[in-house]
Amino acid sequence: MTNMPNPQEGGSYNPSNVSPQPAQHKNVSPTESNQNEQRPANTEIQIFNQGPNGLFKTGQNDQNSNGQNPPPITNANGEGRRAEIKKSSIFGATLMITNICLGTTIFTFAVRAKSFGLVWLLVFCVIVALLNYWSITRCINSSSRSGKDDFSEITEYYMGRKGRIALNIFLIVYSYATLTCFVGLIYPLFGRFIQSAFYRTKYRDYDHFEDEKWGKMYIKVPFFVGLALIIGTICLIRDINKLNFSAYIGVGACAYAIILVMVQCHSYYKHYKNTVYKEDDDSTHANWVNFGDAFTSDLVFFKGFANLLFAYACQSGIFPIHAGFKMQKDGDKKMKISSALGMLFTTLLHFISIICGFLTDPITPEDLIIYRKDKDNGKDIPMVIARLLVAVSLIFTVPGYYFPLRLSVINSFTKGILTTKFNIIFTYVSVFACSVIAAIYDKILNYLSYIGFISVFISFLFPILLNIKSTGKKFTYWKNLLDFILAIVVCALALVAFVATLKDDITG
């Protein structure tokens, strides 16, 4: 359940297993050819074979798109083997793309319906989905033209080493921000579970419970320390396939919560009509189509747009999925079909979440899991279970946001070498740093605005620039120019959201 792909990590490189390589293809860059050189036997190095979210593996072909025979790699136990490729199906790739896009933040977007109006918020979901599909097709084009399946390698192929470093910096910042956001979500999820399960009569809602008890430092400090130790220990794992089960737990918990909200929203809306709605009082009327409130001094429109950009961000996960189609007839066409279906399914799930969240509380729609007020302060056992399931699933799925962070760091600064000492130190320092930030700064919607701004560079600017480079045509060619202008407009909208959110944080 994640807005980032999970790289498959595992094993060490054994030069004795490497067979002689044929001459390099003319499209192979010097950097790539150097990766096939033998290394000393005592060098510990990771061979990364990306497989987003671990739902199915994508391995190296017996012969890749450049006509080269890849060297054998080792598994997590150090045993030599040649990675097996599993060809992607349209259905499997669609599920992968949908799973990359979705996360527990899906339950927060109904909050924006109050300002956007329900209908207009749904319209903007469609617009953002179309923008992302447009960007994804550019990713597929640049991957096909370069013959490479790795985002960083494609960037270096067309933009040089400086371009690759710039991309990895954005990926590192994005991964840290996303990791911090989801670590921060675990705390209120557990707090809401405890309040609704054990303190429902003593504290009227979660805000009251947090002010009086859960938010106290004597609870918050040991909670985040323990959480960092647990997540950090899980993140030490090098082979992400050992966490395959977490994807199913996360999807199952999210699906259970969505189905529950769908079932309950009718009774909540009926409760609103009977107890809150007054025909002669506009303040009690639901905002169905009034878009004007989105353009206030708070710049809610731009913040909401950035939130949606983050919700659909999946471009860096497209490349390894695309690799499974390359050996198939009409592979690019199949990839574009699965991408379109992935955007469609993601949009449908967002529609369900937004509509149900809006109907649950049309006046002040809240987060559906944490801040939703239980009807008549009743004990909602199914929702109590949902909160616990989502909180526990996050503990096991958060490491999925850490793996691409570690991958970007070692590719940028350690030349792919990952020693045990570096793994332990970097992992615990990173997780504890994110936990400290999450404990101090807990504004989830603001996190989404910041991450949305960072994501546009990874999801729009880099893919469009790479596509322009790969066409071999001048920058001023009308299609290239149109793509670039559209990407800049998206980045500008996200920049306004970033500045507005930063201003809110500074001014209080």
What are the roles of these predicted feature ranges?
Residues 104, 129-138, 227-236:
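Central hydrophobic cores of alpha-helical transmembrane segments in multi-pass inner-membrane proteins
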Residues 98, 126-159, 174:
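Juxtamembrane transmembrane-helix boundary signature
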Residues 115-130, 251, 452-453:
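Loop-to-helix transition at the N-terminal end of transmembrane alpha-helices
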Residues 110-116, 228-250, 324, 436-447:
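Membrane-water interface regions at transmembrane-helix termini and the short interhelical loops
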Residues 127, 131-135, 254, 456-463:
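Alpha-helical transmembrane segments and their membrane-interface exit regions
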Residues 88-106, 226-228, 309-317, 492-493:
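The first (N-terminal) embedded transmembrane alpha-helix
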Residues 2-108, 132-134:
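Membrane-interface "cap" regions at the ends of multi-pass membrane proteins
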Residues 82-87, 91, 142, 148-168, ...:
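Membrane-interfacial loop- and helix-cap regions that link adjacent transmembrane helices
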